[in-house]
């Protein structure tokens, strides 16, 4: 695109302000925002991008906007931050009447009307990079017709909400630039409380999930195929090398699960191993299946010392009901491999699951919950798990569980 204007347009990308005082800190920045910023800088000319991080108070957030005086303000959030985020949008609209407000992320994708009715001008639905960049170019050209931009919601001239056609998912993640390192205040993030290497950073290695657990909100992204997109092992290794050169010594490989494709997971490990970086550590998230001893050996080779494993339940009926697509035998086999290679495993369990069968709601019994807790305790005693976490299942908007409970009037929207 040719450079058609002299004035630089200022854009704010923000996390919801979630702290009560400025002394609080977050573990990591929003890597989605950093990837988005890098893409926008590649596709939109003559701009300045600012990042308002989550460790600001609401007043601090507003003061930063007032100081920057942006042309566009973007905020991204999931449903568990809905309340703080909607309050923020409302406050920003009240303080800055002419500012263009764009909401993105999981919650605006599911409930764009909530955001538009409280003050947002647009919602970006689904993946943000291509849509946000196209919307910015349209805004900066002062065009008033947004109907041809896929993947947005806005209010038309009659006040009715307009939702444009869905945008295709980005198939080749290698085409996306690496995160915008200059955007965030790296030293203000605490990282994980337990680690083997410091400082810490993260890489998003894939997008999407081929599985369909009923408690997950992943269906909101599955409006198109391919659902699962994997960065090439070479591309991941290149970013690892860059992060290492900046002094980081532990990397979290972020994904829904690292092993949806066993060959790819092994190839990623091998590509990292070929870098011969001896003093760096990794952590990631696995499924109990598919897995084999070779993958666990390769994880050990690259100093992957910690993995999270979603087990959820010890009951066959429940695992089938929530569509987890694993068995207890697979869980035990996976943990046995990980223990052999001295990889610390954190197991996650959910209590009082629910699902639908033959048109009727089904519920996990107290006996089944106790069986799961007993199973978790046995895994700790055998040192197959190092830590466990459990909690009540929560119906996340966009999940099949949420839709089932709404359908049977067991919760309200």
Model regions and ranges:
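N-terminal [4Fe-4S]-dependent radical SAM core
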Residues: 2, 6-12, 17-20, 149, ...
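Glycine-rich beta-alpha loop elements in corrinoid/cobalamin-binding modules
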Residues: 9-10, 39-169, 398
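Flexible glycine/acidic-rich beta-alpha junction loops that bind and position SAM and/or redox cofactors
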Residues: 20-23, 112, 157, 263, ...
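Glycine- and acidic-residue-enriched helix-capping/strand-helix junction motifs
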Residues: 20-33
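Radical SAM [4Fe-4S] cluster-binding motif and immediate context
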Residues: 28, 174, 179-345, 353-355, ...
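A general structural detector for well-ordered alpha-helical segments in enzyme core domains, enriched
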Residues: 36, 61-64, 84, 88-92, ...
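Catalytic cores of alpha/beta
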Residues: 112-117, 294-295, 356-378
């Amino acid at each position: 695109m040719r450079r058609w204007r002299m004035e630089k347009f200022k854009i704010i990308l923000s996390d919801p302000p979630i702290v009560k005082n400025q002394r609080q800190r977050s573990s990591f920045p929003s890597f989605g925002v950093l990837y988005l910023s890098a893409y926008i800088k590649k596709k939109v000319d003559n701009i300045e991008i600012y990042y308002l991080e989550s460790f600001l108070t609401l007043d601090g957030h507003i003061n930063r906007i007032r100081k920057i005086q942006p042309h566009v303000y973007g905020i991204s959030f999931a449903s568990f931050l809905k309340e703080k985020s909607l309050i923020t949008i409302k406050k920003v609209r009240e303080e800055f009447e002419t500012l263009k407000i764009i909401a993105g992320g999981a919650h605006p994708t599911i409930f764009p009307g909530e955001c538009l009715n409280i003050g947002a001008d647009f919602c970006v639905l689904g993946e943000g990079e291509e849509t946000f960049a196209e919307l910015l170019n349209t805004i900066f050209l002062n065009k008033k017709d947004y109907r041809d931009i896929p993947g947005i919601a806005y209010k038309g001239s009659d006040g009715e909400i307009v939702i444009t056609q869905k945008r295709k998912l980005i198939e080749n993640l290698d085409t996306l630039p690496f995160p915008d390192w200059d955007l965030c205040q790296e030293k203000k993030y605490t990282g994980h409380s337990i680690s083997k290497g410091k400082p810490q950073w993260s890489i998003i290695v894939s997008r999407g999930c081929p599985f369909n657990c009923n408690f997950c909100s992943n269906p909101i992204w599955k409006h198109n195929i391919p659902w699962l997109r994997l960065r090439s092992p070479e591309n991941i290794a290149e970013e690892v090398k860059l992060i290492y050169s900046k002094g980081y010594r532990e990397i979290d490989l972020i994904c829904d699960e690292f092993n949806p494709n066993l060959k790819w997971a092994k190839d990623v490990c091998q590509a990292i191993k070929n870098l011969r970086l001896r003093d760096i550590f990794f952590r990631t998230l696995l499924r109990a299946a598919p897995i084999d001893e070779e993958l666990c050996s390769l994880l050990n080779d690259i100093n992957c010392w910690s993995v999270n494993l979603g087990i959820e339940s010890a009951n066959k009926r429940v695992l089938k009901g929530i569509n987890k697509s694993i068995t207890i035998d697979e869980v035990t086999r996976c943990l046995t491999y990980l223990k052999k290679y001295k990889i610390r495993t954190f197991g996650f369990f959910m209590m009082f699951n629910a699902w639908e069968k033959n048109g009727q709601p089904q519920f996990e019994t107290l006996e089944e919950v106790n069986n799961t807790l007993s199973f978790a305790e046995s895994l700790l005693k055998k040192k197959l798990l190092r830590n466990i976490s459990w909690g009540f299942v929560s119906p996340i908007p966009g999940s099949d569980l949420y839709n089932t409970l709404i359908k049977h009037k067991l919760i309200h929207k």
